[in-house]
């Protein structure tokens, strides 16, 4: 099955798993997904993730979700830049998500990073998603 938005698919799987109170969720692996998960792990939105390679050349990522007192750590996770409508911002116009309580994940020339890192490095890029 071909997906038009693999990153959006991963975010939807995470959102649905949190809604069903699952402890983990799996998704096909890609470099972009792995880099986004690195940011989510560093910011404390997921517990961990691991990649499994199969004999047929494909690989899968198992994401361990994080809860605090039984409630999901992630309240809202949404794709911003979509295949039909890309959203680019300069370093000065990176939005503050939920008045600074959430993060935006950007794809920049210096790699995939959280919004506060992009502001520190004075680099703009494509807003991939927002997490609160």
UniProtKB/Swiss-Prot annotation:
InterPro entries: Ribosomal_uS8, Ribosomal_uS8_CS, Ribosomal_uS8_sf
Alphabetic keyword roster: Ribonucleoprotein, Ribosomal protein, RNA-binding, rRNA-binding
Keyword Lipid biosynthesis: no
Name of protein: Small ribosomal subunit protein uS8
GO molecular function, one term: structural constituent of ribosome
GO biological process, one term: translation
PROSITE patterns per UniProt: RIBOSOMAL_S8
Subunit structure, as described in the record: Part of the 30S ribosomal subunit. Contacts proteins S5 and S12.
Organism (species): Mesorhizobium japonicum (strain LMG 29417 / CECT 9101 / MAFF 303099)
Function field: One of the primary rRNA binding proteins, it binds directly to 16S rRNA central domain where it helps coordinate assembly of the platform of the 30S subunit.
Family listed: Belongs to the universal ribosomal protein uS8 family.
């Amino acid at each position: 099955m071909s997906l038009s938005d693999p990153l959006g698919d991963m975010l939807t799987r995470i959102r649905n798993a949190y809604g069903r109170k699952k402890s983990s969720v799996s998704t096909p692996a890609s470099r972009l997904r792995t880099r986004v998960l690195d940011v989510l792990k560093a910011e404390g939105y997921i517990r961990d993730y691991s990649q499994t390679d199969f004999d047929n050349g494909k690989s899968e990522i198992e994401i361990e979700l994080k809860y605090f007192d039984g409630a999901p750590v992630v309240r809202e996770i949404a794709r911003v830049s979509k295949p039909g409508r890309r959203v680019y911002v300069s370093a000065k116009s990176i939005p503050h998500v939920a008045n600074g309580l959430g993060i935006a994940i950007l794809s920049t020339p210096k790699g995939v990073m959280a919004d506060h890192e992009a502001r520190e490095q004075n680099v703009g890029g494509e807003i991939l998603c927002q997490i609160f």
